Amino acid sequence: MAAIGVHLGCTCACVAVYKDGRADVVANDAGDRVTPAVVGFLEKEVIVGLAAKQSRVRNAANTIVKVKQILGRSYADPHAQKHISENKCIVVEKGGKPKYEIDTGEIQKLVSSEDVAKLIFSKMKETAQSALGSDVNDVVITVPFDFGESQKKALGEAALAAGFNILRMIHEPSAALLAYGIGQESPTGKSNVLVYKLGGTSLSVTMIEVNSGIYRVLATSTYDGIGGVCFTEALAQHLASEFQRTYKQDIRGNARAMMKLMNSADVAKHALSTLGSANCFVDSLYDGIDFDCSVSRARFELICSSLFNQCIDPIEKLLEQVGCKATDVNQVVLCGGSARIPKLQLLIKDLFPEVEMLSSIPPDEVIPVGAAIQAGILLGKENLSTDLDTITIECLASDILVKETDESGNNKFTVLLPSGTPLPARRQHVLQAPGNISSVCLELYESVGKSTVSEECKFAQIVLKDLQKKASGVHDILTVLTMKRDGSLHITCTDKDSGKSEMITVETS
């Protein structure tokens, strides 16, 4: 039985298969190795991938894009609100959760983000099964390093609903290193690897220390304001200006015409990664006018010059954050479809002239390839001289905190597991509660960076009941947190006086 790795990104999804000692991305039924993460609801059917993306011009209100941005979030979450404001499909609140409102004329229904992700996972499963000629269930799924517990849980539920058996969730930077076997060739050496990922809607830069075969995340930064879509939009705006210059018609306020230009610009952007020029032709763009325009790579680079600067600045900030110079970096790994852009690769190379830049695996395929290798390891298919399983040490992406009450009665948060903690990990903490109560509720929260902890950040709670009340003093509650490498969290609370105990497990899937 083959093992597979699946990467579900904001704009695209990809599946790789590990078989006969190697991992390869497999093409979908359209012959493409990368599938648009787009779902369209029609009167009689649901379509996923390129067909949904192409039909969006005529069916925008019932076509869902960038579902990963909203997956596992509450309706009130600022990230969800941003997604809702930018989406052509109506999103409503139901039980505190966002739901897509679908109305095809034949069907009116509410669809959750998990339902949409399930359809994309099902497409990936079908793609793998078609390539292998047999059923496939075991999978390793990639997640961004800054994905919270609720997001991972939602992603896992979607994959399970699609019929997958999740072997493990692996952070995207770790998958990228696995794809190139980094740490395998010199397991006792120490090196710094910078993982640069420019995806469809975000940019992430991660510094990983590889030491004695162990991956340790030194720092990571994610920027949601820059991604491949920004380059597409910039090119589409240029095409709109060219149309106005030629035909004296300003179409930038016409949503349908601009969506057509976005599709054409996206195709041209991809072509310009390998060609010196690309042709943008749109049939009946506006008022029956066919639009035909050629764009050179040099022109594209000029149009996007400010975007390139935005893509490079985060690298310099990360180096400063970890106290490294460019010469301290041993390798740079490129990930994400937009990391294919030659100008971007040149700018990164200028920053690291003496550093090995790894891009032999297509950047939009490297993460699922690494996930497939991890799946092969977990199924016992890997037979390398080095046990790669020893180097896939995951790290905690966010701080895990417990809410307590200080002496003045105000809430305070104590970090039990700080971000960057290598997994598996175990921590103990004594929580004190007033002796005159008979039950204690332990609440756990997660927080990324210096963000404020709010109720939106709570992901688990455990209640210890029927405690013997005390006339004076406090209850000492011993709390033990154990997080496994797969991200599952086991929480045990024990009253030190009575020995009464409760335990819960928070699974990643």
From Swiss-Prot:
Keywords of the record: ATP-binding, Chaperone, Cytoplasm, Nucleotide-binding
GO biological process, alphabetically ordered: chaperone cofactor-dependent protein refolding; protein refolding
Gene Ontology, cellular component aspect: cytoplasm; cytosol; nucleus; plasma membrane
Superkingdom, taxonomy of origin: Eukaryota
Single GO MF descriptor: protein folding chaperone
SUPFAM superfamilies noted in UniProt: Actin-like ATPase domain, Heat shock protein 70kD (HSP70), peptide-binding domain
Localization: Cytoplasm, Cytosol
Protein family according to the UniProt entry: Belongs to the heat shock protein 70 family.
Subunit structure of this chain's protein: Component of ribosome-associated complex (RAC).
Function in brief: Component of the ribosome-associated complex (RAC), a complex involved in folding or maintaining nascent polypeptides in a folding-competent state.
Listed name of the protein: Heat shock 70 kDa protein 14-A
Organism: Xenopus laevis
Taxonomic placement: Eukaryota, Metazoa, Chordata, Craniata, Vertebrata
Encoding gene (name): hspa14-a
